[in-house]
């Protein structure tokens, strides 16, 4: 990775990430006070090693100062002294600042690990960060950040998809890290904004945990990104936002597909579905991770309600 700020597992072998998603701040800020208070409280209670913003940090359409707005969101992590990484959502660059310029807002920020990514592939903000071992200079895990775009061409409609050149880039990065790890895939996570179509599949075909109060708003085109993740064998879990009142997760072909918990108050939500954040904890040397929710009222949700596909029942074994 090109960044000189190296992430590392703690001496106890853990690494904790807080995922904030769909903050939807704007530069007037009036409706974001409870959002920022929530974020500050989560960081104070969880003391993570990294904050990841999985898109729609701002509602940029009509905002005269979108760069200021997006900086105000990530400043919450800066004030807490915690490094952060960003992927853009479909609402972050709908106004006067284009996507390429918006991701570069974080260049030179001492707390930002965000990268614009290769100029010769689709999207802005495709990059990978490695976590060094607690007592080693070798990578112990990897975090992939992928730009899922915004909107599909009008003749297709709906949302954008992760492009083939981005998938090829991921495969190249994964291959290199696997070779560096003695031929064994490096335990990894992937973060992007718009869920891939397999989020619908896992809900309909497997036992999931958590809520689905709206349809999965994935692209109409399945470009094969999830297939590549399965084939490479390194990514253990994916984390998205986009659908504000979904927070479920389920495992499909060995990969846990996870929604975050929508964080922002300046956007749609649901009565009785508090804003919050998803917490992710890696353990050095293990191909596994723990995850839980921390909600606005301080509740920590370790076990989410199970959902079974139609016609299935829980085993009593």
Language-model features, listed with the residues they occupy:
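Active-site-proximal beta-strand elements of phosphoester/diester hydrolases
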Residues: 14-27, 140-150, 191, 255-262
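His/acidic metal-ligating clusters that form di-metal
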Residues: 47-50, 142-144, 156-247, 315-316
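Extended active-site neighborhood of metal-dependent phosphoesterases/phosphodiesterases
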Residues: 2-9, 69-183, 278-283
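Acidic/histidine-rich helix-loop elements
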Residues: 21-36, 58-68, 94, 153-161, ...
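Binuclear metal-dependent phosphoesterase catalytic core
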Residues: 4-6, 11, 128-133, 137, ...
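Divalent metal-coordination and catalytic microenvironments
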Residues: 22, 39, 51, 56, ...
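N-terminal active-site segment of His-dependent metallophosphoesterases
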Residues: 1-78
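Active-site environment of divalent metal-dependent phosphoester hydrolases
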Residues: 26-28, 59-62, 86-98, 151-154, ...
């Amino acid at each position: 990775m090109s960044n000189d700020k190296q992430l590392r597992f703690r001496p106890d072998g853990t690494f904790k990430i807080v995922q904030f998603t769909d903050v939807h701040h704007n530069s007037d800020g009036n409706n974001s006070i409870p959002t920022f208070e929530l974020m500050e409280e989560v960081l104070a209670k969880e003391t993570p090693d990294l904050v990841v913003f999985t898109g729609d940090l701002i509602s940029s359409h009509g905002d005269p100062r979108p760069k200021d707005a997006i900086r105000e969101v990530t400043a919450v992590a800066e004030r807490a002294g915690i490094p952060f990484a960003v992927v853009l959502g479909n609402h972050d660059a709908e106004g006067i600042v284009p996507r390429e310029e918006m991701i570069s807002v974080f260049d030179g920020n001492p707390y930002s690990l965000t990268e614009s990514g290769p100029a010769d592939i689709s999207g802005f903000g495709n990059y990978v960060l490695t976590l060094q071992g607690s007592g080693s200079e070798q990578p112990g895990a990897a975090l992939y950040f992928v730009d899922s775009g915004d909107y599909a061409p009008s003749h297709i409609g709906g949302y954008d998809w992760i492009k083939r050149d981005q998938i090829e880039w991921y495969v190249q990065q994964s291959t290199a890290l696997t070779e560096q790890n003695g031929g064994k895939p490096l335990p990894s996570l992937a973060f992007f904004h718009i869920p891939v179509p397999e989020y619908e599949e896992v809900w309909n075909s497997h036992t999931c945990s958590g809520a689905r109060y709206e349809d999965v708003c994935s692209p109409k085109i399945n470009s094969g990104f999830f297939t590549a993740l399965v084939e490479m064998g390194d990514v253990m879990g994916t984390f998205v936002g986009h659908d504000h009142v979904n927070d479920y997760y389920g495992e499909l072909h060995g990969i846990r597909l996870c929604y975050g918990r929508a964080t922002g108050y300046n956007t749609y939500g649901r009565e009785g579905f508090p804003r919050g954040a998803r917490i992710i904890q890696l353990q050095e040397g293990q191909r596994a991770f723990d995850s839980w929710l921390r909600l606005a009222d301080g509740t920590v949700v370790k076990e989410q309600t199970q959902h079974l596909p139609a016609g299935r029942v829980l085993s009593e074994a």
